[in-house]
Amino acid sequence: MATPASITNVTVEFLQFPALVTPPASTKSYFLGGAGVRGLNIQEEFVKFTGIGVYLEDKAVSSLGAKWKGKSAAELLDSLDFYRDIIKGPFEKLIRGSKLRTLDGREYVRKVSENCVAHMESVGTYSEAEEKAIEEFRNAFKDQNFPPGSTVFYKQSPTGTLGLSFSKDETIPEHEHAVIDNKPLSEAVLETMIGEIPVSPALKESLATRFHQFFKELEANPNIEN
């Protein structure tokens, strides 16, 4: 399948998310499904912490389009199943989380892991194996500090492996810092970003808007699936 022609770069604050990325030592490119800001309301002010971009393997458009083409952007945005199909889809994903303000690695991973555990417990996938995976996940971040512009990359495979790498800018490192083989945890990481209780509603909206355009292109040119 060809990469959608309608794909564009996205800017989140001072962060640039290019339309395509190719990791080092790889011939495979990933396209930008969407990007948005993650923040919290603190004392009646929305404080922005991170810009998140979700990149996908090119076959994701045809895979998702089989079910979702023809839907409006608003319909996609309102459908949790659409986002769950992204999360659980049989294609690789590369998530880029770049910092807008300084974050301590331990504090960052504490909140992320709490959200992941809460989701896994709610859907009944949190067992001893996931508890061990969460411990590995936390250990990977314990010595990290993230100044503005630095990045965490999460590489997700359909089989359930979660690769973690850290960069002082937006450059994808050649080697992963850690690889955790646990599908419930891998899915939970993206679920907490774009699922039922998302940390980035802006990312969800970006995905819906952009995939609506990708699906229109797919309908106009069915050969794009080949």
Swiss-Prot record:
A Pfam family that the UniProt record links to this protein = Chalcone
Positions that bind substrate: T50, N115, T192
Q: Which function does this protein serve?
A: Catalyzes the intramolecular cyclization of bicyclic chalcones into tricyclic (S)-flavanones. Responsible for the isomerization of 4,2',4',6'-tetrahydroxychalcone (also termed chalcone) into naringenin.
Which keywords fit this entry according to its UniProt record?
A: Flavonoid biosynthesis, Isomerase
Q: Part of which pathway?
A: Secondary metabolite biosynthesis; flavonoid biosynthesis
InterPro entries given for it?
CFI, Chalcone_isomerase, Chalcone_isomerase_3-sand, Chalcone_isomerase_bundle_sf, Chalcone_isomerase_sf
Q: Which reaction does it catalyse?
A: a chalcone = a flavanone
* SUPFAM superfamilies per record: Chalcone isomerase
GO BP, sorted A to Z = flavonoid biosynthetic process
Q: Which family does it belong to?
A: Belongs to the chalcone isomerase family.
Name under which the protein is recorded:
Chalcone--flavanone isomerase 1B-2
More details: Part of the biosynthetic pathway for all classes of flavonoids, a large class of secondary plant metabolites, many of which are brightly colored.
- Residues the record annotates as the site (Important for catalytic activity) are Y108
Molecular function via GO: chalcone isomerase activity
Respond yes or no to whether keyword Isomerase is given for this record. yes
The record's listing under PANTHER family reads: CHALCONE--FLAVANONE ISOMERASE 1B-1, CHALCONE--FLAVONONE ISOMERASE 1-RELATED
Q: Which organs or tissues contain this protein?
A: Expressed in roots, shoots, flowers and seeds.
Gene3D superfamilies the record matches: 1.10.890.20, 3.50.70.10
Q: What induces it?
A: In roots by B.japonicum.
Q: Does the keyword RNA-binding apply?
A: no
Instruction: Write the Enzyme Commission number(s) for this entry.
Output: 5.5.1.6
